[in-house]
A protein has these predicted regions:
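Hydrophobic transmembrane alpha-helices and immediately adjacent juxtamembrane helices
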Residues: 1-259
């Protein structure tokens, strides 16, 4: 829990103050910490999944049990850590000025979907890590790059208008960005009130937002991804990744622990 908080502090100094990414985002501290905590859950699940089979090679060789229990157990440990971190996140969100509303209940299905996605991703990483010793050393580098494409420290909606629409869609629909956005929509009223599409489309006001970064005017822009699309994407990523992970991991069930 301390590492995500320290990362949040560094990102706030670099992106919030130095690069002024806090412009156009109400309650940037809550926005940033939410993104860091949610992404860290997926990041740790994937990184741990890539090392779990080799780290437990002696146990695998000594006992007969479903090998999938190992990566899944580690994801559950990370999920417990996330729940503990929520005890820190909630006060931060409230202190910054966000109200406690019934929308917070949506956090439950969001976290369940993310945990499901993480399980599938961990199973895939577990098989890849078991087959290639150096693979697990590459994963932290890749997840670090992934972090910068998920809108953790900035708003994807406020990216320059010159950026192609397809590129914004790719950023918005990547799984980590989807679960981060759903979480922010659940616990941050300002994200629902001032997100693109919250108000009827107004080209002039939207254009002013793109140059002046005025949060209220952001609501008058066309949404990159609607709330319904976010939920469909979140469900889709969770189901597809879990099924793919189970099948991919199970195909090598008898080979784990050899060599």
């Amino acid at each position: 829990m301390l590492t995500p908080l320290l990362n949040s502090a560094v990102y706030y100094l670099v992106f919030g103050i130095l690069f002024q990414q806090n412009r156009g985002i109400y309650h940037y501290t809550a926005y940033l910490v939410t993104g860091v905590f949610i992404f860290s859950f997926t990041e740790r699940s994937i990184v741990t999944g890539s090392t779990v089979m080799r780290a437990n090679i002696a146990l695998i060789r000594a006992l007969h049990f479903p090998r999938a229990c190992l990566p899944l157990a580690y994801v559950m440990v990370e999920f417990q850590q996330l729940l503990v971190s929520m005890l820190v996140l909630f006060p931060i969100v409230l202190i910054t000025g966000e109200p406690l509303t019934w929308y917070w209940l949506f956090l439950v299905p969001v976290l369940m979907l993310q945990a499901t996605f993480n399980m599938g991703a961990a199973l895939i990483m577990a098989r890849l890590g078991a087959g290639a010793q150096d693979f697990s050393q590459l994963i932290p580098f890749l997840t670090r790059i992934w972090r910068y494409f998920c809108g953790v420290m900035y708003s994807i909606a406020s990216l320059p208008a010159s950026l192609p629409e397809w590129a914004k869609n790719v950023l918005s629909f990547n799984p980590a960005a989807v679960y981060i956005s759903l979480t922010r929509n659940a616990i941050m009223y300002s994200q629902r009130e001032y997100a693109p599409g919250a108000q009827p489309y107004n080209a002039l006001k939207c254009a002013i937002f793109n140059t002046k970064k005025i949060p209220q005017l952001q609501a008058y822009c066309h949404p990159i991804v609607t709330t319904n699309q976010l939920w469909l994407a979140g469900i889709g990523w969770a189901v597809v990744t879990l099924v793919a992970g189970v099948l991919y991991f199970w195909q090598a069930e008898t080979r784990y622990g050899r060599g």
